[in-house]
A protein has these predicted regions:
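CN hydrolase (nitrilase-like) catalytic-core segments centered on the catalytic cysteine
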Residues: 1-76
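Cysteine/selenocysteine-centered motifs that mediate thiol-based redox chemistry or coordinate metal-sulfur cofactors
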Residues: 29, 85-120
């Protein structure tokens, strides 16, 4: 996904981890204000960075394990327990009672296709 320093980014990372029952490591950059980079943007406060970071490590149930790291470059670390993946999937029913093989079918087309297709 696109880099985003706002709180919504943190919420999105937590949701992705929870929905996928997986660990998420989100590394976000830090950049000074546009003015300090020689770029003038109308109404941009000189003390506001272009990107303020927000790197975070999230567990499979959406819990923040490290971060978010904002306003500075740094290294986030977290001790993870891969058994958390198993525990997180106890209530993760991807093919359970609401899967309807009697009315839905998943077909995967394995033929190679171009990434972009131009039509007239």
């Amino acid at each position: 996904p696109t880099v985003d320093e706002r709180e919504m980014w943190q919420v999105s990372m937590r949701h992705i981890a929870h929905e996928g029952r997986c660990f998420v490591v989100s590394a976000c950059q830090v950049q000074d204000s546009p003015q300090s980079l020689g770029v003038e943007i109308a109404n941009w406060p000189a003390d506001r960075p272009l990107i303020a970071g927000g790197s975070v490590i999230v567990g499979p149930m959406g819990d923040v394990l490290a971060g978010p790291l904002r306003g500075e470059a740094g290294l986030l670390t977290a001790e993870i327990d891969t058994d958390d993946l198993i525990r997180a999937r106890y209530d993760y029913d991807v093919v359970g009672h609401y899967a309807r093989p009697d009315i839905f079918e998943l077909t995967v087309d394995e033929r190679a296709k171009p990434g972009v297709k131009f039509t007239a």
